[in-house]
Amino acid sequence: MIESDRIITASPFSSQEEVIERALRPVQLDDYVGQEKIREQLKIFIEAARQRQEALDHVLLFGPPGLGKTTLAHIIAREMGVNLRHTSGPVLERAGDLAALLTNLEANDVLFIDEIHRLSPVVEEILYPAMEDYQLDIMIGEGVAARSVKIDLPSFTLVGATTRAGMLTNPLRDRFGIVSRLEFYTSDELSKIVTRSAGLLDVDITADGAREIACRSRGTPRIANRLLRRVRDFAEVRANGRIDRQVADAALQMLDVDAAGLDVLDRKLLLAVLEKFGGGPVGVDNLAAAINEERDTIEEVLEPYLIQQGFLQRTPRGRMATTMTYQHFDIIPLQQAATPGLFNPD
């Protein structure tokens, strides 16, 4: 199974899903659910910048995919009353690509660069003076005839988004005045998001139905909205169109998403640790071979959520199952089963 096949992946499935996501996005900070600290900070910073009639400081948003970094970039531009230009690190292959974007910005506009950690070194070098001095240094000509030309730029706000903050160079990171880490959402926050999205999609849903979807959404709004749409399909075909807890549970079981938000691949990994390696520790290469997956898939796709939720522990000796993992699968640890009298005198 690859990441794009998983219904609980935090990455968008397709351009069609991105269109649906845009329709569900909040457009102002007051409508944005979750990330309370970031939201309050941005309210203050944006209002201060507007009062001074200045561009907002450059903003770096980082955290797991699907948590709302792109949404926040759009909200920042809307709250500032300016235009937003959207691009991504891999698209900006040459210095000229970035120069074309920068020279077309208007005063105080927002330039949003997704996957900013994937900028090439050449493009990144051009970005430094643009961020600091609102100037573009470009080389014209070649060889001995080459000369540097400075072009003044309008003041602007760069909003960078990344899931891999550790891959940013220090010089780039240091040029952001506002740095915010987005965290996984609580079930209560996701319930509000599901309820709001259901209203926009004209879906009849009860509070406990929204809660059931929220609890299995891995702390991620993008997953919550995707599950809502799939549960809606189930409700229209197998029920009366109304989503309550029972309908949501039946639909999510059909989709192989269990009560903890784990799917087939998550369970395959955890059961391998439990059954093939006695709960661990096990090295990631051995684990990858045991479940026939790539090492990168385990480290970048599966582990973050499992570790964050307490199902997996990363130690110097390898990966280990936790007490929660044994309880989730109703499996008795080997050492406990071997000495029943110690734990269960009966």
Swiss-Prot record:
Residues 186-256 are annotated as: Small ATPAse domain (RuvB-S). Mg(2+) binds at T70. The keyword DNA repair applies. Its main location: cytoplasm. Its EC number is 3.6.4.-. One of its GO terms (cellular component) is Holliday junction resolvase complex. Has 3 domains, the large (RuvB-L) and small ATPase (RuvB-S) domains and the C-terminal head (RuvB-H) domain. The head domain binds DNA, while the ATPase domains jointly bind ATP, ADP or are empty depending on the state of the subunit in the translocation cycle. During a single DNA translocation step the structure of each domain remains the same, but their relative positions change. This is Holliday junction branch migration complex subunit RuvB. The lineage of its organism: Bacteria, Pseudomonadati, Pseudomonadota, Betaproteobacteria, Nitrosomonadales.
